[in-house]
């Protein structure tokens, strides 16, 4: 039955029956008075009081530190048996010795002095052992606090952590969730103490935060504080990792997962405790994803967005592709978040040109990934593309690729919307390959194609002119042979492109002339029918066809003029 009491019998001297019963946690220990009274002042007083009142010797110890297991160890020590003290039992044994008043004054080499010696020699000299002892303090928190054991453990952790080299963190791999993981194969014997970051995750959050606050108040490097926080967050907030590995899933199965409210509170507290510097961008993205999933406070999300935005050049394309967790967003990825992060980055007046270029390539990569989203509206694509300053893009090939994918996926958008999106591109920044592709791209609006063709012709003339120019020093002309060969090769490529362009324009002219003849014929037939009362308006006017001979004629003249000028040159 649940109420029945278990009994533990201890007869360490043959033939001597027990003369006292002590109850701890519903377990009755049948013991002997003499060894207990010789070591414990409190038990001596309790046994003496019962003997004077002539009551059967049965003592119940309420709220005994460490419970029946620790009391059993105390009994063995009192009887003179050898007991191996470990880090996990040293703290509750010290508290139990205080509870039973097993002082040095009462009996030499008593339990208090033994446990204090063990703590000072084997626990407070090692950071990992101090963390284990601090974990043991949680079960005897009140006595551990009054004896200052908890404070001593925290001070020991902070002191020992100060000897850890923060630069060793940067060589460690990072998993998909954005949190550091330990590469144990690469660790040397001298770096084994760095595993204490994982040990910190076993602490309860109130105790862990006391450690963090103590770290921040000391001269400890921000990298160590950051790593401690992020490792703890990964262990207790599953949403930080984008994909769980086998190791993380196995470890999470043994860890009790907190409720959503507890995770949210934990995340907000960890975020507020992050150092102002030295936080890795990828780790922050993991926290930001968790903040969105857990619907953390606005201040928490703004803080993370500000920290990420200030170091956006350190992010990767995978970091920025955060799924839309809100049902209000129709797009696959959170485009508004990317736009806010970019604005945060541009607010920094100290942005270098190299960082701006890196972010430019990053945003063009994002545009290329989101362009295939059927729910992405033209204004959303345009707003993100136009937000980058002109100097952020050295070449516009990445932007052109994104625009081409968007037009291919969204063939239904209006011509005006296409022209607006193409206005972000600078055709002068397209490479030769980009210009060649754009000149033959039927998805681009006509205005964009004309701009590309015009710039191709301009570039061709500039290359030819620049190649033929030589330095005139009065004596002789010096021509760089290597540069000449390169220019000739590029000239040949451009000539082929011009031939392709000319063929396409000729086809367009033929189609225009053919359509003009067909429409003229239809209008002529309509006029004849109108005279006989068959209709009043011509089909050309009815359908709004406004093809004029002047348009095609002017284009023909222009092309003839271009050809003549080219052959003359």
From Swiss-Prot:
Domain BTB: 18-87
SMART domains per record: BTB
Feature: compositional bias, Low complexity: 240-259
InterPro entries in alphabetical order: BTB/POZ_dom, NPH3/RPT2-like, NPH3_dom, SKP1/BTB/POZ_sf
Pathway(s) of this molecule: Protein modification; protein ubiquitination
Keywords from the UniProt entry: Phosphoprotein, Ubl conjugation pathway
Species of the source: Arabidopsis thaliana
Protein name: BTB/POZ domain-containing protein At3g50840
Modified residues (Phosphotyrosine): 400
Domain notes: The BTB/POZ domain mediates the interaction with some component of ubiquitin ligase complexes.
Family named by the database record: Belongs to the NPH3 family.
Pfam families: BTB, NPH3
Domain NPH3: 194-459
Region of interest: Disordered: 240-261
Keyword Phosphoprotein: yes
GO biological process: protein ubiquitination
Keyword Membrane: no
Gene3D superfamilies the UniProt entry points to: Potassium Channel Kv1.1, Chain A
Function description: May act as a substrate-specific adapter of an E3 ubiquitin-protein ligase complex (CUL3-RBX1-BTB) which mediates the ubiquitination and subsequent proteasomal degradation of target proteins.
């Amino acid at each position: 039955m649940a109420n029945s009491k278990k009994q533990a019998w201890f007869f360490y001297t043959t033939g001597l029956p027990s003369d006292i019963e002590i109850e701890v946690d519903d377990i009755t220990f049948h013991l002997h008075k003499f060894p207990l009274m010789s070591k414990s002042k409190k038990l001596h007083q309790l046994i003496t009081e019962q003997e004077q009142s002539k009551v059967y010797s049965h003592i119940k110890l309420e709220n005994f530190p460490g419970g029946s297991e620790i009391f059993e160890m105390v009994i063995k020590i009192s009887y003179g048996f050898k007991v191996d003290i470990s880090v996990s039992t040293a703290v509750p044994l010290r508290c139990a010795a205080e509870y039973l008043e097993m002082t040095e004054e009462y009996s030499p080499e008593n339990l208090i002095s033994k446990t204090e010696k063990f703590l000072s020699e084997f626990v407070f000299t090692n950071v990992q052992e101090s963390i284990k002892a601090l974990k043991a303090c949680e079960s005897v928190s009140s006595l551990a606090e009054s004896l200052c054991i908890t404070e001593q453990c925290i001070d020991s952790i902070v002191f020992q952590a100060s000897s850890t080299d923060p630069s060793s963190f940067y060589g460690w791999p990072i998993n998909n969730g954005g949190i550091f993981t330990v590469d144990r194969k690469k660790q040397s014997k001298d770096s084994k103490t760095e595993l204490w970051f994982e040990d910190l995750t076993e602490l309860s959050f109130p105790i862990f935060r006391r450690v963090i606050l103590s770290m921040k108040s000391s001269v400890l490097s921000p990298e160590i504080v950051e790593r401690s926080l992020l490792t703890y967050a990964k262990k207790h907030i599953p949403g930080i990792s984008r994909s769980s590995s086998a190791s993380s899933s196995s470890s999470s199965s043994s860890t009790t997962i907190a409720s959503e409210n507890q995770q949210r509170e934990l995340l907000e507290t960890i975020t507020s405790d992050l150092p102002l510097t030295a936080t890795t961008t990828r780790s922050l993205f993991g926290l930001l994803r968790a903040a969105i999933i857990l619907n953390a406070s606005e201040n928490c999300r703004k803080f993370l967005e500000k920290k990420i935005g200030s170091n956006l050049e350190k992010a990767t394309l995978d970091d920025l592709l955060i799924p839309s967790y809100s049902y209000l967003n129709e797009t696959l990825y959170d485009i508004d978040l990317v736009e806010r992060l970019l604005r945060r980055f541009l607010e920094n007046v100290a942005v270098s040109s190299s960082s701006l270029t890196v972010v430019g390539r990053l945003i063009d990569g994002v545009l290329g990934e989101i362009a295939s989203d059927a729910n992405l509206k033209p204004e959303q694509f345009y707003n993100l593309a136009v937000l980058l300053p002109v100097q952020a893009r050295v070449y516009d090939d990445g932007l052109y690729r994104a625009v081409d994918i968007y037009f291919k996926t969204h063939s239904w958008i209006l011509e005006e919307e296409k022209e607006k999106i193409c206005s972000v591109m600078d055709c002068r920044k397209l490479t030769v390959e980009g210009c060649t592709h754009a000149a033959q791209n039927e998805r681009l609006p006509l205005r964009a194609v004309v701009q590309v063709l015009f710039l191709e012709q301009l570039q061709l003339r500039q290359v030819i002119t620049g190649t033929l120019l030589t330095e005139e020093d009065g004596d002789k002309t010096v021509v760089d042979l290597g540069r000449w060969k390169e220019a000739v090769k590029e000239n040949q490529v451009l000539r082929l492109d011009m031939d392709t362009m000319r063929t396409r324009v000729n086809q367009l002219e033929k189609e225009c002339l053919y359509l003009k003849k067909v429409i003229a014929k239809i209008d002529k037939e309509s006029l004849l029918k109108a005279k006989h009362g068959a209709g009043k308006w011509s089909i050309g006017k009815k359908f709004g066809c406004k093809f004029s001979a002047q348009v095609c004629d002017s284009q023909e003249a222009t092309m003839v003029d271009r050809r003549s000028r080219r052959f003359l040159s």
